[in-house]
Amino acid sequence: MAGELILVVEDNEKNRKLVRDVLTVKGYRLLESETGEEGLRLASEHHPALVLMDIQLPGIDGIETLRRLRADAATATIPVVAVTASAMMHDRQKILAAGFDGYQAKPISVRPFLELVREVLDRPPRSGS
């Protein structure tokens, strides 16, 4: 169901704009953050249905941000998808092994990206840590 709140944690404005344009036209509501620290605060305050997160962020990176989200009972069950330029197979495996709920390589292809977002949102809630 469209209308869900999605947090986008991405330091590149062009990438945020692309994701914003793709998701808002489908009816999703967005929060945006340029850093992992701000993303943690927004996730805790707003409890989005999904977090889309870059891996290479200023300050704490996406993997550390995910670790902190999972360690906090208030945000531990929020699904998090990595959206990253790290497209090599070993990078993908490392990212998924870190506990991300999905992986999207950049540049994004709109249809597969929207399918991934919908698929992750439709999954049963994850168990808390």
Where on the chain are the PLM-derived regions?
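Conserved acidic carboxylate
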Residues: 10
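Acidic catalytic/metal-coordinating carboxylates
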Residues: 14, 35-38, 61-67
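Charged docking surfaces used in two-component/phosphorelay signaling
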Residues: 17-25
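Short hydrophobic/Thr-rich beta-strand motif most characteristic of the beta2 strand and flanking loop
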Residues: 27-34, 42, 104
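Short amphipathic alpha-helix used as the core "switch/output" element in two-component signaling
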Residues: 41, 63-76
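Active-site beta3 strand of CheY-like receiver
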Residues: 46-52, 57
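The feature encodes the CheY-like receiver
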Residues: 58, 76, 88, 106
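C-terminal output helix
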Residues: 108-117
